[in-house]
Amino acid sequence: MINFDNSATSFPKPASVARAVSEAVSHFGGNPGRGGHKISGEAAQKVFEVRSRAAEMFGAQVENVAFTLNCTYALNMAIKGIMQFGGHVIISDYEHNAVSRPVYALWKMRGVRFSVARVSDDDDETVGNFRALIEKDTRAIVCTVASNVTGRILPYKKLGELCKQHNICFIGDGAQACGVVGLTLADGFDFLCTAGHKALYGPTGTGLLISNGAFALSTIIEGGTGATSAELEQTGTMPERLESGTLGTVGIIGLGEGLKFVRRKTPEAIFGHEMRLCEQFAQMIAQDKRVKIYEPQVRRVPVVAFNIGDMHSEKAAQMLSQKGFALRGGLQCAALAHRTLGTLQQGVVRFSPSVFSEKAQVNALARAIYTMKE
């Protein structure tokens, strides 16, 4: 099976990540920060090394890097931590459910109001659409850096500037961009949320919540942190405040090797390789008159969203799976984006290569699409 569903989870992983995970299971089994003994200290040191590596990559202070289970958890922590006590929040019409569902839940349970800004092909118009929705009690703008459906890159730097002008918290969903776009907090993010298991090439069960320290978060999870254990109130010390319970040390150590891998390759080189494959794929399948490609001209991360005639995208993905290719059909957990694209009923088939994908594999996939019958 050839994996072209790397936007969901990159696979295969670098060999160094697999080795690091194996070594962690065998040699770093202590509970980090939970005891003064050697095995706890060794695990804590490994976790700190990965935290420091992430801080360096994303331009953060090391104490402002919190580990999470995935990007969805990071987004929930940031959105609910900022909006827990009410107010108004703005999101885009390209959001993943990891943004839209927490916002909807806040509206339903806490009366938080939200607005949805329309994304335009003109970046200045997009920013203007966000600006027009700002109210007196707008506390945050939350948006994806890049759509997980079409790969479209939103004007995140300009939105960061807009937030700074109005003293609004800017929360970025970097799940599809971190690792292929050189994002840092200097791009204007107050919180940058991302997955470890996608383009950072770490194991599943890893994510990052990265902050510039400008906005304090209310907690949505409390518990043991290894700090101020005599107090009933959750510690205010970062990152422990956001890391209740035992950390996933094995996954974190694997993520550390993924970060090393990306830094060594560079996001720019990875982006270039994957985008060349996307362009090759798009050019080949465009020769099939049945194929429709969505947003082919927009600035995007390496993703191609397409459909084959009137065939439902999930059926197409299933047929391709039978031919040995893994692609994602359906709504990609992003109903807002599909409503915007007009694909809510059919969905799309998503092609997303990785640094390990090859031209010959893309050619074989295109040939398989040519032979598919509706």
Q: Model segments located where?
A:
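Pyridoxal 5′-phosphate
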Residues: 1-374
